[in-house]
Amino acid sequence: MGYVRWLGHAAFEISIDGYTVLIDPWLTNPLSPVKVEDYRDKVDLIIVTHDHGDHLGESVELLRINRRARFVAVYELANYVAEQLGGATDRVIGANIGGPVRIPDINLKVMFFPATHSSSRGTPTGVLIVGKETSIYHAGDTGLAAEMALVGELYSPKIALVPIGGHFTMDAYQAAKAIEMLRAKVVIPMHYNTFPVIRADPEELKRYVDEFKLDAKVVVLKPGELYQF
């Protein structure tokens, strides 16, 4: 049995098909229930959606204490991370929006999709992870985007992790529309209440999902809690 564990903000720990995956591991965020050291020698894969500090987080430090872990991001961001580690390494894999990324020793499908946001190193993205146990879409930082409908049409991810804080990303109303396009069955809100400017009530997302009569379950996690699948 796998799980999705919210670590505050947009950071998640995912256990899928026997792998431990971290997405956007800003583990020093104000809501975080964990420390970087908690993950020493425990991580198989780190995925980062874009280069903003609240998403890249402690990726480099985590790679240093997880010598076998792989890192995947868009090409320009991956190059930056490799430089921080001292130069080119096969542990850091640069990819782009498109089909599945080939990751040595990791038997998961990982695909990047466009996100409507900003980024200094490469294109901002959302990411889809497809394993034998389930499929999970992490939307990254994004506004509402038409490409989400294509993700839903092609892959219908079973679990969607969507921002609801507004100001920098979608709010709850737009996130509900994103859920409709993604066709996800389970939705976990993220990227809210870290700072006053992105304060939001996740119950509002539930209300919109009910109002739109969507076939989706909204799972509200407290930092550190997990959803098992």
Curated annotation (Swiss-Prot):
Molecular function GO terms recorded: hydrolase activity
Superkingdom of the source species: Archaea
Keyword Cell inner membrane in annotation: no
Keyword Ribonucleoprotein: no
Gene3D superfamilies per the UniProt record, alphabetical: Ribonuclease Z/Hydroxyacylglutathione hydrolase-like (3.60.15.10)
Pfam (any one): Lactamase_B_2
Keywords, ordered alphabetically: Hydrolase
Family note: Belongs to the UPF0173 family.
Protein's name according to its UniProt entry: UPF0173 metal-dependent hydrolase Hbut_0886
